[in-house]
């Protein structure tokens, strides 16, 4: 008996058209998950004023941070699988439905949030969602709180014994799979490491990233890890 319902949640806020990558990825969901219900969350079916954080992020047009809350709300209240619109499915996902809750590693040390799944009412997702009850996206000094949900969820799981080692583990009923299952693409280099375990690819479109960060990451990919590390070392040496 499956514990996680065959229901896919995704978010699209801002009223803009879906980019080609999103259309391609959603088409892959329909191809490999034909019996799954697919639900889009947007301004019409989510109350933006339910959380001050959401309203402030929305009005700042930082829609990715809106989805940080909405994905947790959808999963906690309805159960199912949440996917970012830049997640391409490569094969059926039935193999993860027996877990109480499941995600995976984004890197050797961090939990990815591009694909998350749980049964309705999972207590850890309740805690993760409630963290936003008293949060504001716009700080008292007017700056924006750009803390990612990857950081928030990783930090919460650390309280429950999460070991940042890219190895299969279950933390407070939340099973975490190694990178190659759900997130085989390196966030920094964009290199793909697909294995027989790989179920999907998170393409890391990164629409929420500031342009300066996008430029920095593009430069890092062009230079490669070794040269980038050498440049960082040289910069630190020169600043001494």
Range-by-range predicted roles:
Residues 69-80:
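Small-residue hinge/turn detector
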Residues 1-67, 83-240:
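Glycosyltransferase-associated regions of secretory-pathway enzymes
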């Amino acid at each position: 008996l499956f514990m996680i319902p065959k229901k896919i949640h995704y978010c699209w806020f801002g009223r803009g058209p879906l980019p080609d990558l999103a259309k391609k990825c959603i088409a892959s969901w329909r191809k490999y998950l034909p019996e799954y219900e697919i639900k889009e969350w947007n301004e019409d079916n989510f109350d933006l004023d339910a959380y001050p954080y959401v309203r402030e992020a929305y009005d700042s047009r930082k829609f990715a941070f809106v989805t940080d809350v909405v994905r947790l709300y959808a999963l906690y209240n309805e159960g199912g699988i949440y996917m970012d619109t830049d997640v391409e499915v490569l094969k059926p996902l039935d193999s993860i439905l027996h877990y109480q809750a499941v995600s995976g590693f984004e890197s050797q040390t961090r939990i990815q949030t591009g694909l998350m799944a749980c049964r309705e009412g999972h207590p850890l997702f309740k805690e993760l969602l409630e963290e936003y009850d008293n949060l504001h996206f716009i700080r008292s000094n007017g700056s924006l709180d750009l803390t990612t949900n990857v950081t928030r969820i990783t930090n919460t799981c650390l309280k429950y014994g999460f070991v940042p080692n890219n190895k299969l583990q279950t933390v407070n009923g939340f099973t975490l799979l190694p990178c190659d299952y759900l997130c085989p693409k390196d966030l920094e280099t964009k290199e793909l490491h697909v294995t027989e375990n790989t179920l999907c690819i998170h393409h890391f479109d990164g629409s929420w990233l500031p342009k300066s960060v996008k430029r920095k990451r593009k430069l890092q990919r062009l230079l490669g890890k070794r040269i980038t590390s050498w440049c960082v070392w040289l910069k630190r040496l020169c600043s001494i």
